[in-house]
Amino acid sequence: MIERGKYQSLTMVNWNGFFARTFDIDGLVTTLSGGNGAGKSTTMAAFITALIPDQSLLHFRNTTEAGSSQASRDKGLYGKLQPGACYAALDVVNSRNQRLLFAVKLQQVAGRDKKVDIKPFVIQGLPSHVKPTDVLIESVSATQARVRQINEVKESVAQYEGVQFKSFSSIVDYHAQMFEFGVIPKKLRNSSDRSKFYRLIEASLYGGISSAITRSLRDYLLPQNGGVKKAFQDMESALRENRMTLEAIKTTQADRDLFKHLITESTNYVAADYMRHANERHKKLEQSLSLRSELFSSRETLIEQNRLLNQVQQELEMLVESESALEQDYQGASDHLQLVQNALRQQEKIERYQEDLEELNERLEEQSMVVEEAQERVLMAEEQSTVAENEVDSLKTQLADYQQALDVQQTRALQYQQAVQALEKAKVLLSDSTLTAESAQALVAQLTQSEAEQTQALLALKHKLDMSSAAAQQFENALKLVHSIAGQVERAEASRHAKAAIQQARSAQQVVQNENQWRAQHRDLERSLNQQNQAQALVAEYQKAHQVTLDDEVMFEQERERHHAQLDSLEIALEENRELRSEQRRQEQDLQSDITQLQAIAPKWIAANDALEKLREQSGAELADSQSVMSQMQQVLEQEKQLSQAKDKLAERRSQLESEIERLASPGGSNDPRLKGLADTLGGVLLSEIYDDITIDDAPYFSAMYGPARHAIVVSDLSGIEEKLVELDDCPEDLYIIEGDVDAFDDSSIKAEELEGAVCVRLNDRQMRYSRFPVIPLFGRAAREQRLELLRSEREEVVEKHAKAAFDAQKMQRLFQAFNQFVAEHIQVAFAADPEQALVIARDKRNQLTRTLAELEAKELQMRSQIQNSKQALTMLDKLAPMMAVISDDTIGERFAELEEKIAQLADAKQFLGAHAKAVEQLESQLAVLDADPEQFDALEAQYQSADSQLQALKKQIFALSDLVERRHYFAYADSVDLLSKSSELSEQLKAKLVEAERARSRYRDELKQQQEQMNQYNQVLASLKSSYQAKLETVQEFKQELAEFGVSADEGALERAIRRRDELHERLHTSRSRKSEYERTLTSTELGMKELAKRLKKVQKEYVELRTFVVAAKAGWCSVLRLARENDVERRLHKRELAYLSAGELRSMSDKSLGALRLAVANNDDLRDALRLSEDNARPERKVLFYIAVYQHLRERIRQDIIHTDDPVEAIEEMEVELARLTEELTMRENRLAISSESVASIIKKTIQREQNRIRMLNQGLSNISFGQVKGVRLNVKVRESHEVLLNGLATQQEQHKDLFETARYTFSEAMAKLFQRVNPHIDMGQRSPQVLGEELLDYRNYLELSIEVNRGSDGWLQAESGALSTGEAIGTGQSILLMVVQSWEEESRRLRSKDIVPCRLLFLDEAARLDAKSISTLFELCDRLDMQLLIAAPENISPEKGTTYKLVRKVFKDHEHVHVVGLRGFGQEQKPKSEAQQMIEEFEA
């Protein structure tokens, strides 16, 4: 048994008097006891606010203003709250044992309206040990706490694993969550449902019989059965729509032939004119393009000739201007040549004298050298003579004294040894082991030179030191000279710059000396360079003309041979080109013949191809050849047969489903409609109606338990039934009758045992029945409705499949007919080659041939031009031949540039000498002054010491070497060592040496005399040469002065340049005159050609303008035609390719024939007739398209778009051909199936009424034993209104009488019911309601019932429950009973919407319970115990119930702070209910 959910506690945070209070809600009754103002109503207000957080409904008033509409502005909630965040939370444990905390956050909103901001939320899965205040309140200290904000509550909850926090933005979502978890009894979908729930809570709270509820008992107790009303409305709308659609189809069928005729003729009429205009426009465009091409080419030619004319005129003008300048230049060049020749003759004289001077100078220098050599020879002869004299004297002395000779030999031996020692010493000092006496003399010279340099440097430094103090002024003068030559320099760098200037002056003098040689070379190179430039100009001109560079003579010869070969090949190609042109013209004529033939074939092929493409699109097959067409045609036939069979099977299945749905929709779901009539005859009720409200889960069990008797009739008494049965004429073969109370049927008499998936029923001691649970139970309304839903879904699917199959079958039939027609008309042509493609190829070839012919003509002109160019090139090559030798010499330019640089240096040298010669000459004498800067004395002194030390070391080396050199003769005395041992031979050797020495002395004396005489002769010759040189030099100076007066450069180059310039100017003057004559001839011929071309251009332009004006005008109309056609999607209908091959006359004939047919077809339609009349204007082709659009628009309006879903009338008619047969049959069957009978309507309404009466009887059973004061029982009385009962009888039994209302198409079923209600109740005023509105009300069964509350009070018996006839306590008790009945009704009504394992909470309120006596309160306790309901009541202090939980509330005021003191008491007489296993486990866990 599923336990009912219970409210566990109510938590109030920050309410008036309640900062953080949790009230445990008792399982039965929770009593709030206290005096006035203790807070009882505030506590209930918090509970109700958490239950229904809708500020538009909440209105807490005391009992004194219960009936007042003018309550306080804040509706009793604003004043019950404290500032800041407030909470009201309901702790609930539902049937699934889930703990839920449904809470609302409240906060006062400042303002006059005293509104309260309410935000609902829920916390799910909070652990049992956590109190609601633990998450809503935060402890600040041991004595202080604060209220958390809602986001802080969310964060606080997040610390518990598995706990979910969810806030709600709408009350609907909050109540949906409450309903889902079983907190409220009914699903509150909208504000109306919330209002009903609040009115129920309010009526419970304030007690008594609520007029708001009693007046609307039908809305509270009777569920809305919208399915019946909706089913009737759907059937009505379907019937109405079917009838309208059927009428539209019939109308379309009647007009279809007219539409086809209208579309065909209008298409032929407009398309023929459309294509005729398109063809004409195409031809005109081709003509205009041809004229425009000719016009543009003529213009370009004229512009080119005009440009040529202007260019020739400009060049002629420039030529005339340059010719006069050339004449002047030529005369000047001739005069200049004469002057250069005079200067050259003068220069020749100077050169002859200079050659004499050079010769004299050379002789003078040679003679000076001869004199110097003679002097040297005289000196050498004198030295040799002196040495010989000394040797003779020495030998004579040695012979005179032998001992002296011996001493001399000893001395020489000693000298030899000293010489050897000197050699070793020199090797050590020089660190040279290879040193010898012979190399010592050369090394001495080197070191002596180095010594001289260092000595000179040392002396210079010494001189600088000596002069540094005394030569300051001299240094400044020398520095000024340096500044005048080299500019501003540093003092330290002055000496270096001075030396550099002196060196530069010397270099400049050398450069000036080479002037004549360089100028001669410059003249030769300039001549060669000019010749090379002239050749390069010719080469450049040749390259510009022929794009070939003549680099050398090999290339030159190759070009000459190439041009000769090209001339030969061009002559041959020119002949071949003529033959090729003839062949191309022949092919062009053949292609034109093929094009004409293809144009004749194309229309038939296009029609066949369109039909083939349509077949391919419809069938989805490739259809590559005729065999595939025949094969696909056979497949289509087979598919059509299969689809027809499938359609028939689906129609059969649909009929089965509809019959089953009709059976299940009948009262009781019986498969025999006679049972309902038998039940009425026997005065019973069908068993299926009694069990109509069982759940889906219980349906298999009860269906198996009753077995075949599930369609039995239940009667209150079996006596007399047999007699009635005998009198029956028509009844089922097996009829089961069961005796039992219809209002309280009990199945305890059936001995049934539930097995696994089955039921075993013992009929008697010897019989038993075993019935399995049906797979698809149909016992009970819920099971039948579930089955009906499945069957209806299947029926919809079957209907959809049947419609699709019928459509596909019709489509296949149409496709087979299309295949038949294609085979009969087009199959012979359709698979031939595409003539349009062949046409395109042929036209492309023809155009290609035309272009080829044009290219051949252009090629011929090009070849002639190339021949002319080759001839010109050969002429140019002949001119260039003599000059090719120098063109390949790349060094000329470099050498010329080098000489140019040298000549430039010459000019610089002359300029330098002219500017600084005197300064350099002065600087040479003062150069030593600059070596010692008086400002650098210390540096000079240190430099002097360093140089001195180096010089001393060098002197030591020189001394050693000089000693060695001085003693080198002693190495010849090596034999003296030997002579010392051979003294006898010494005398003889000395005598021999003396003789030899005397001969040498005589020879040297003779040579000295000769040399002296020769030197005197040389001196005389030198004096005469000096005298001749001085005379010649003076003459040359006079000649140079005369040459300078000429003012020209007198050299061979200047003469050649002058001659060359004169010749060039003469040649240019001759060329200019030739070109002038040529330009004048070109001007004349060009002007004549331009005149002829201008005449032709004017003619072509006139023709083009006229044709273009026509084309532009036609284009404007054609654009409007195209725009209209494209915007209205008719271009593909009008642009028929096959019409493009017809002539204009044929197209006009077709259009005229269709025009006649259209005049007859639209004679009765004013709009189309007017549009057709306007379209006959040939000057306005767009009007024909407008007529075609009007026809289409007319057809679109006539075709039902709700049946045929397409915008194209042609496609719509084609689709309608397929749909018409299927829809006609389908609509007829549907109309028969949807036909509504008045009897079935009455039966459905009666069945629904009876079901609700049975449900209310069951509700009354729960209230049968309730007593309050004198009231011993409470019940709900339900009965059918008399006027509506008369209506039901008229629907069920008087069908023939009211046939005029239900079998006419004038009224819908709702309107027919309204008319019948007026007919059977003429005394009732219907007011302003329309028949449709009244009929819809009559389809709602609740309008047939009247509900009232009756109480069994004392001796009065059952009477109407009214507050005036009952005491206060009795009224409160009666009201609570009624409310409990409503809650039960809501639970039953919502059972299907809620989960099966959820039983909702039941809780009601009662404020001011002191109005009930103790017995009444005890009755309430008993009612709560019996119906498992919780009750929250408020009572004064003098009421202390024995059961439940009682809270004593006392409001205390301490200074400015109010606090409600609460004491909770458990009822001392309360009996503990046995705890469930789950509760016991929970308590164990908590412990």
Curated annotation (Swiss-Prot):
InterPro entries: MukB, MukB/SMC, MukB_hinge, MukB_hinge_sf, MukB_N_dom, P-loop_NTPase. One of its GO terms (molecular function) is ATP binding. Residues 667-784 are annotated as: Flexible hinge. Residues 297-426, 460-666, 781-806, 836-1111, 1210-1266 form a coiled coil. It is found in: Cytoplasm, Nucleoid. GO terms for biological process: cell division; chromosome condensation; chromosome segregation; DNA replication. Keywords: ATP-binding, Cell cycle, Cell division, Chromosome partition, Coiled coil, Cytoplasm, DNA condensation, DNA-binding, Nucleotide-binding. ATP binds at G34, G35, N36, G37, A38, G39, K40, S41. GO terms for cellular component: cytoplasm; nucleoid. Belongs to the SMC family. MukB subfamily. Plays a central role in chromosome condensation, segregation and cell cycle progression. Functions as a homodimer, which is essential for chromosome partition. Involved in negative DNA supercoiling in vivo, and by this means organize and compact chromosomes. May achieve or facilitate chromosome segregation by condensation DNA from both sides of a centrally located replisome during cell division. Homodimerization via its hinge domain. Binds to DNA via its C-terminal region. Interacts, and probably forms a ternary complex, with MukE and MukF via its C-terminal region. The complex formation is stimulated by calcium or magnesium. Interacts with tubulin-related protein FtsZ. The hinge domain, which separates the large intramolecular coiled coil regions, allows the homodimerization, forming a V-shaped homodimer. This is Chromosome partition protein MukB. It comes from Vibrio vulnificus (strain CMCP6).
